[in-house]
């Protein structure tokens, strides 16, 4: 779901800023 995607992305962003989101997509 969209909420789950956002949750995973935010969690990954907090752990690894400027690296990867919850789905392994590169985030700047």
From Swiss-Prot:
Keywords: Calcium, Disulfide bond, Hydrolase, Lipid degradation, Lipid metabolism, Metal-binding, Secreted
KW Calcium (keyword) present: yes
Main location: secreted
Catalysed transformations (reactions): a 1,2-diacyl-sn-glycero-3-phosphocholine + H2O = a 1-acyl-sn-glycero-3-phosphocholine + a fatty acid + H(+)
Residues that bind Ca(2+): 28
Necessary cofactors: Ca(2+)
Entry EC number(s): 3.1.1.4
Gene Ontology MF term list: metal ion binding; phospholipase A2 activity
Function: PLA2 catalyzes the calcium-dependent hydrolysis of the 2-acyl groups in 3-sn-phosphoglycerides.
Protein name per the record: Phospholipase A2
Organism expressing this protein natively: Scolopendra dehaani (Thai centipede)
